[in-house]
Amino acid sequence: MAKGKDARVTIILECTSCLRNRVNKESRGISRYITQKNRHNTPSRLELRKFCPSCYKHTIHGELKK
């Protein structure tokens, strides 16, 4: 039997530079990725460098609040 909650949880990563640069009117939206993280290994918020199709470059994607 499993004790408590599962260690793996599904998270959503969102582009941080798209949120700051809302100046572009022709923006195709905000880039979001869905992934999983292990809560025991990384208890803090996750930040990864991923490709953003709206910015056309690699940017930092941060974990959204639940």
UniProtKB/Swiss-Prot annotation:
Where, per UniProt, does this protein localize? Answer: Plastid, Chloroplast
Cited Pfam families: Ribosomal_L33
Q: Which domain of life is it from?
A: Eukaryota
Write the record's keywords in alphabetical order, separated by commas.
Chloroplast, Plastid, Ribonucleoprotein, Ribosomal protein
**GO terms under cellular component:** chloroplast; ribonucleoprotein complex; ribosome
Q: Which Gene3D superfamilies match?
A: Ribosomal protein L33 (2.20.28.120)
Q: Name one GO molecular function term.
A: structural constituent of ribosome
Q: Which GO terms describe its biological process?
A: translation
Which InterPro entries is this protein grouped with? Ribosomal_bL33 (IPR001705), Ribosomal_bL33_CS (IPR018264), Ribosomal_bL33_sf (IPR038584), Ribosomal_zn-bd (IPR011332)
Q: Which family does it belong to?
A: Belongs to the bacterial ribosomal protein bL33 family.
Please state what the protein is called.
Large ribosomal subunit protein bL33c
- Gene source species: Morus indica (Mulberry)
